[in-house]
Amino acid sequence: MAFGRGRGNKRTSTSSYASTITMVIFVALCVFGVWMLSSNSVIPPQITQGSTRAAVAETERSDVSASSNGNDEPEPTKQESDEQQAFEDNPGKLPDDAVKSEDEQRKSAKEKSETTSSKTQTQETQQNNDDKISEEKEKDNGKENQTVQESEEGQMKKVVKEFEKEQKQQRDEDAGTQPKGTQGQEQGQGKEQPDVEQGNKQGQEQDSNTDVTFTDATKQEQPMETGQGETSETSKNEENGQPEEQNSGNEETGQQNEEKTTASEENGKGEKSMKDENGQQEEHTTAEEESGNKEEESTSKDENMEQQEERKDEKKHEQGSEASGFGSGIPKESAESQKSWKSQATESKDEKQRQTSESNTVERIMDGNAWVLCNATAGTDYIPCLDNEEAIMKLRSRRHFEHRERHCPEDPPTCLVPLPEGYKEAIKWPESRDKIWYHNVPHTKLAEVKGHQNWVKVTGEFLTFPGGGTQFIHGALHYIDFLQQSLKNIAWGKRTRVILDVGCGVASFGGFLFERDVIAMSLAPKDEHEAQVQFALERKIPAISAVMGSKRLPFPSRVFDLIHCARCRVPWHNEGGMLLLELNRMLRPGGYFVWSATPVYQKLEEDVQIWKEMSALTKSLCWELVTINKDKLNGIGAAIYQKPATNECYEKRKHNKPPLCKNNDDANAAWYVPLQACMHKVPTNVVERGSKWPVNWPRRLQTPPYWLNSSQMGIYGKPAPRDFTTDYEHWKHVVSKVYMNEIGISWSNVRNVMDMRAVYGGFAAALKDLQVWVMNVVNINSPDTLPIIYERGLFGIYHDWCESFSTYPRSYDLLHADHLFSKLRTRCNLVPVMAEVDRIVRPGGKLIVRDESNVIREVENMLKSLHWDVHLTFSKHQEGILSAQKGFWRPETSQ
């Protein structure tokens, strides 16, 4: 029970005596009224706390619906309707006969279920109580009465209406049946009542999942029983905007019997205590105050509704904590404390809103309506990181071909690259090596400039490739055999397996090396030699768009068996030989550099000067000029150099120029790393990579590299050599059993393949017997396993899939992504990544995704929005697989 602010303790003995007499008279009137009501089954809700408590307990489950009855009066929450005190100023205990009569009258009322004169008697008794208590109130300090009255009039009306509803419910029940939890309250007395009410409250909460106002009661029952009632009570007062002094008034009257009962009830109900204080003030409210405070009561109603909504969000967490047994002994936090301290939820709110905004963007794109065509100058050949005109215009210099290097936009594009007019499905390999559809790569300038060198010619609706080049106009195969004859130790397809072709042109050299079981990483810049790399990729020959400029190429150190340059227009001798030093970094110790250029065999003044400078530079690099040979058929010559396999020459040089790199310089670092004019030493430790030449092809494909030792932990948790072997066996099984037969993919027209997240290169190794080549991509934030891939006779590149890949649109027949997107989604948005996938894959091309089930669903939705044909999706144990095929659909709108 709650009282006025400290008034009970400050009264004189006369005032206390008068109050006692008034109480006795009032009790007598109550007994008389009860006797009169015994035949009418009327139970005034404001007479005793026991009757009020019982009435509220029976109607707790209907609080939410009752709170929306449309009246102008403030609608009390459950806490406000739990207990109603009739004697504010009397600290004494109610007579036992009064309580007993009340209980008997309640039972009688429930048995008869008659409600005919309930309203009238309730209002009369309420008026009598109001008159008597108003007289006593005039003797006391009424500082707080107005505030309390504003909120309590509506509460009294609420209790009456709840009681009437209770009687209506009783008429529908069998005679003598009581609502759940009521009987225990009627039989309980004194300290036993809170325990019964606690059980009732828990049962009611279990019965109702939508009960908003009951949220905090159960959570507070055990803390109150362990002596933390004060904290919880204060917390509840703060939540309801009530001063703490009203609670302290209850605690200061602890010597009175009636207060003991009230304290017990407060300990059992916790959150309800402030509502009880509101309840005992109902008798002070007059009809005049009711009509004068309508507007303020409406404001109170809004505040109560807001509090109910806040508690509704907390209910699930509180019930879960109570059910687990973790709620005991924990005081309830106040609304003020929650405002003062930021929670994880509030701190994360802005971030969630940001992500929601991104998610909405994803949803708009995924519905297929937000995809638009790119509006770039490059048109159908758009490469975002190489055609960033804004970044290129800001370059301070183009001396080192900076304008041909990567400059990715800050915001990765989500637009789609349009198709060339008249585009057709690409011609299959090996026919594609000799001819392609003109409309697929509609560029004729190169044919005009290089046609006489047998690079490319226009033949009707085809572009044909005689197989020639600047240095081998009579065909690449003859030139390849010429190099083999010049140096037998080259041993194509055995000792020499992976090469780098710099300035590849249309990549005829690399295209015909397949017949010698050699794979070539061909590169050329996107320059005035129109679409030369695009020609190569359309011919189904591996190539990337790159330039020897100011930064290292995205390859590890000491991985290429041979590097080739046939009039590649690279000034190797300039800048202290910086570009040649980059080749030295990538060339395997003991590997060869083949230089087929005019300075080797012509005697023009310029060529002679270049030859002298080149000879001095290669000597300072300790490269040995193994042979110079001339090809009479083509009228050209080639110089072949070999990189040293030891450091002996480096240590004997008279001049330290170019200098050796510092010991802490990482030769493998290659992602946007500037070039340096220095040399890295050759590894001498027998267990270090580069100290030995790999075993011959094809045995090197499945042989663990010698520098992987058993004490080293592999990517999948096994010792590195066994991890390597296990990965290979795994992918052989997956490819043969699943990819070849069960995912709806026809491999007959698959040639250009990319493994978007290669580890050991096991997927590419498993495709060895197919007529395909695989670009193995090692992500920059993944373990650096790219040297292992090269060691086994495969090739690959470093890349970050949050950026665009350095290749032309419509380059690949199949992309393979093994657990890529789940790792990318923590770093970048998947929508630009999927737009990049759509850019890289040619119409009719395929995509295989293995990933978490939720990622598979997300990717599937985006693919469908792109009008891809999804062949298969399968999930098991939170893992899934998806295969899809790209069509010819393009959006109708542009940026």
From Swiss-Prot:
A biological-process GO annotation: methylation
Cytoplasmic side: 1-16
Biased segments, Low complexity type: 115-127, 176-191
Polar residues bias spans: 43-52, 199-232, 243-256, 337-346
TM stretches of this protein: 17-37
Glycosylation site list: N145, N375, N709
GO molecular function, one term: methyltransferase activity
EC primary class: transferase
EC number: 2.1.1.-
Keywords on record: Endoplasmic reticulum, Glycoprotein, Membrane, Methyltransferase, Signal-anchor, Transferase, Transmembrane, Transmembrane helix
Keyword Transferase assigned: yes
Disordered: region residues: 43-362
Lumenal topological domain residue ranges: 38-895
Membrane-topology descriptor: Single-pass type II membrane protein
Record family assignment: Belongs to the methyltransferase superfamily.
Other notes: This gene overlaps with At3g51075, a potential natural antisense gene.
Protein name (Swiss-Prot/TrEMBL): Probable methyltransferase PMT27
Organism expressing this protein natively: Arabidopsis thaliana
